[in-house]
Amino acid sequence: MRINLNFHYDKLHLKEIIILIPKYHTNMVSFLTPILGLYGINVKEFINDFEIKTRFINFDVIVPTLVKISKIKTFEIILKTPYVISILSNLNNFSVTKPNIDLLSVYKISLLKSVFHSNFLDVFHRRIYLSLRKYLSLVIKVNFHLSVSSALAKKSLSNLNNLLLLKFNIQNNILFAKLLNNRYGLFVSFNNSSASNLNYLKTVLAIQNISIFKAKSNLLSSLTGNKYFFGNIYFIGATSLKYFIGFLKEVSLKSFGSNFFPIFFKIRSNLVSQPFVKLFLSVFNSQVKLINFYALRVIYTIFIKIFKNLNFLNKKLTFLLNRNNSNSNANISSNIKES
């Protein structure tokens, strides 16, 4: 069979047709001759190529096939996603009029459609498809054509991958638990996030019942719809609105001078808009009361309008970071006594 690789040129492109071909037809030649014969395509060559590309389908199913035909009587076959009804009909106790399949069968069908739709395997996704093979084998026998090295199939590496995935999920759960607990706060990015400065900042903020912890940049990007957030991102927040208001009031009255410059994200209109506040509250505080919603909205609106041209915390928080050890210890002790 001749394969022409230049189908994207208009001078060779003639026609694109979609044919619904049964996998096992009693007389495939007579079925395809009226269609392909119009363009001078050899039916037997087409069937041979079709059989090779549909070898992984082991039961009767209608396969939508896109055929690209050139002016020099060559063709290219592209398999489309098979009909879901045709695949479901091969499951036990399935009826089109009265469906009787369990949730696991629906899950396996969704995976099957994904494999048909993505007929290529990425190096990063190979481990995922290996783990799904046992589910897919219950519905259809799929030939994945994987060139997996022996090291990838070793049990020790598989266990290591499972541990890494478990660690990643645990870290995400801890992060969201902290965000749900500290419902009022803001995101900041530090140019310099040394351990000593951060530990000191955590200690001083803890006196005011304020928490600070590291967050992922893609979390803030997903909230605001922007993709330019990167760097050392932290969330500063409190469990109570009054603690957060007291925090903003205190830092707005101080004078500063330091080379440790935190940067406030220039979200501007996105941050002060009502949709962002609603999204922020729906993610981190689904049970917030209406009065708290408007209070937090007013805080963000006033805060950004006043400091939108400044680097927040560059002028408002650095006093917590430029004290020497002796002064910091004295301040912490005095604050503890007052409280």
Swiss-Prot record:
Keywords: Mitochondrion, Ribonucleoprotein, Ribosomal protein
Cellular component annotations (GO), alphabetically ordered: mitochondrion; ribonucleoprotein complex; ribosome
Subcellular location, record wording: Mitochondrion
Major localization listed first in the record, in broad terms: mitochondrion
UniProt GO molecular function: structural constituent of ribosome
InterPro entries, alphabetized: Ribosomal_uL11, Ribosomal_uL11_N_sf
Any GO BP: translation
Annotated Gene3D superfamilies: Ribosomal protein L11/L12, N-terminal domain (3.30.1550.10)
Domain of life: Eukaryota
Family: Belongs to the universal ribosomal protein uL11 family.
Protein name: Large ribosomal subunit protein uL11m
UniProt organism field: Acanthamoeba castellanii (Amoeba)
